[in-house]
Amino acid sequence: MVLTIPTIASVAPVNCELSLDSGRCIKYVATRNSNPKNHVAEELPIMRKNSHQDHHDDWEGVNTICHTIDNIVNVEMETDFFDGKSVLEIGFVTGLPSVYAFENGAEEIAMHTMDKTSLELYCRPTLKRNNIPMIKTKVSCGTIEEAMKFLGGKKFDIILAPDLLNRQEAEFDLVHEILHQGLSYDGICLFSCRTHYANVDGSLTAFLQLVKRRREFEAIERWSSPRTDIIQQKVFQLTRSLF
């Protein structure tokens, strides 16, 4: 086995920007060229030539979430969507959705990532670069089981979850429980995902079947990449079931 050791240049944090169709720009900190896009438009993501998953795929999930919430605020004109709301970011956590939420009126933001390195090198610096007060933020890292402890019984108005389903299907029950425990009664969760993944057995179909079986949430598709993509990107909305 040959182990590939990351170079300093490949992990060094640099200042980046992601511009949105509305004209808004999210400033963030990440590795150079980690995000394949610096502008998000309606045609994202890049058309697939094959089904192989690379390191850019997680960022496509971030881009689609940012595109979706920007569309909600500036196209659907729900300008008060984040006003006074508590926001939780989980999944592939970068801080970009949280920054957008805070700059659009969120009262507080929380982030839980599985990677301590990304938390310290990229997520915290992203919050600092955008002058988000520490008193308004709560961050942690750890396993998906530790995410439940991080919630501590708190309910959030909005959960933003890029690439939420990029995991083994065996973890879906716990993911569902985190959403169930963490989302307020009248809250909304937006998650992005691929329809399926090359390296894990989790899939959108399996998760939606779980949601239907548990009957805690109603799932609505908010956005989809073209059907010509071999593996589509999608954004789904979850809200509490009324019955």
Swiss-Prot record:
The record's Gene Ontology biological-process terms are: epigenetic regulation of gene expression
GO terms under cellular component: cytoplasm; nucleus
**In the record, what terms sit under GO molecular function?**
histone H3R17 methyltransferase activity
Instruction: Tell me the leader sequence span.
Output: none
Q: What cystine pairs are annotated?
A: none
Q: What SUPFAM superfamilies does the annotation carry?
A: S-adenosyl-L-methionine-dependent methyltransferases
What is the protein's name according to its record? Uncharacterized protein F22B7.9
